[in-house]
Curated annotation (Swiss-Prot):
Organismal lineage: Bacteria, Pseudomonadati, Pseudomonadota, Gammaproteobacteria, Enterobacterales
Motif ('HIGH' region): 42-51
MF terms in GO: ATP binding; RNA binding; tyrosine-tRNA ligase activity
The species this protein was found in: Escherichia fergusonii (strain ATCC 35469 / DSM 13698 / CCUG 18766 / IAM 14443 / JCM 21226 / LMG 7866 / NBRC 102419 / NCTC 12128 / CDC 0568-73)
Enzyme class, broadest EC rank: ligase
Family annotation (InterPro entries): aa-tRNA-synth_I_CS (IPR001412), aa-tRNA-synth_Ic (IPR002305), Rossmann-like_a/b/a_fold (IPR014729), S4_RNA-bd (IPR002942), S4_RNA-bd_sf (IPR036986), SYY-like_C (IPR054608), Tyr-tRNA-ligase (IPR002307), Tyr-tRNA-ligase_bac-type (IPR024088)
Top-level division of the source organism's lineage: Bacteria
Homology family: Belongs to the class-I aminoacyl-tRNA synthetase family. TyrS type 1 subfamily.
Residues the entry annotates as binding ATP: 238
Designated name of the protein: Tyrosine--tRNA ligase
Keywords of the record: Acetylation, Aminoacyl-tRNA synthetase, ATP-binding, Cytoplasm, Ligase, Nucleotide-binding, Protein biosynthesis, RNA-binding
Its job: Catalyzes the attachment of tyrosine to tRNA(Tyr) in a two-step reaction: tyrosine is first activated by ATP to form Tyr-AMP and then transferred to the acceptor end of tRNA(Tyr).
UniProt-annotated binding residues for L-tyrosine: 37, 175, 179
Amino acid sequence: MASSNLIKQLQERGLVAQVTDEEALAERLAQGPIALYCGFDPTADSLHLGHLVPLLCLKRFQQAGHKPVALVGGATGLIGDPSFKAAERKLNTEETVQEWVDKIRKQVAPFLDFDCGENSAIAANNYDWFGNMNVLTFLRDIGKHFSVNQMINKEAVKQRLNREDQGISFTEFSYNLLQGYDFACLNKLYGVSLQIGGSDQWGNITSGIDLTRRLHQNQVFGLTVPLITKADGTKFGKTEGGAVWLDPKKTSPYKFYQFWINTADADVYRFLKFFTFMSIEEINALEEEDKNSGKAPRAQYVLAEQVTRLVHGEEGLQAAKRITECLFSGSLSALSEADFEQLAQDGVPMVEMEKGADLMQALVDSELQPSRGQARKTIASNAVTINGEKQSDPEYFFKEEDRLFGRFTLLRRGKKNYCLICWK
């Protein structure tokens, strides 16, 4: 991605919501590499899909020769960002936040190159400059540059101030000052001249731009990526089970892959622009091919492959594809014990059972059937498989060989209704 027209290329992909002084930023980028940053607050023990677009944006800038700084908010994570939040956040303990900082730093690391010469990425933590700052320094050196009149008029907090049932604490109100100072600090430490973030961060970013100008007399810039929405109006990045996480222990690679496979046709080509590094030409060619093929579109599989590989690596992608294929074909011989552990985590409904159970009871306990009577009829009609093999004996008791790896048995009723038995 050539640096001189990087902003234009990001706009073509739909990745720019707002940008400050676009002309001056384009000129600055044309002059040569810059340092830029994006902040990630440890509000949980993992990043989720909402973080992926700004994180990949950092990567796009690095590929164009710029120096990315990934800032994990060890200090701001202790306070909580009120931007567009309906209620006050719960404050987490310092120990919890520190634990989450470590996890998030490890999650961010594979996306960036920390050893590539002059534009090697930097990992930073704002606790390094806030941890030992006393309240008088904070109020005198930072607070005096902020106008409360302007702060209460920022869209991000205005909604909270106007709600009778929910005000805003001084703690959360001061968040804007902390993030603003991050920008000024990174500008001084690493020459950072651009902050990127989600569109909900616009107010915090512009505060940082103003503060950097006041403290260091430097012109810096802000760019926000859009909030990702789906064509049907439902929230992106959520499933029935909640958020889609980047940590494989919270959302398995199989579940992650399936999330992308289930992308609507109305969204898939847009998402290829947001979440992959395919060129616009490649994406347009794929869309044209799908339109004219007369078959199911290929785009969802391309998207699922690309994003799963980015987040979980080749091994995670191959496991996700292997599980998908085995469930589709009914043949489980290729599945490893780790694959079954993914299914048990979140891939299919799971039930724990004591050894010695019979098939009818398993169908009831797994909620594949409402009663033993109904289970008997279903088994007799040849509609039940155990580990891919049909079983038509209603009086069947599980045998040792049904327990794959001594732990797992996969039941299927009909073509698509699965349940995994985990034996106690």
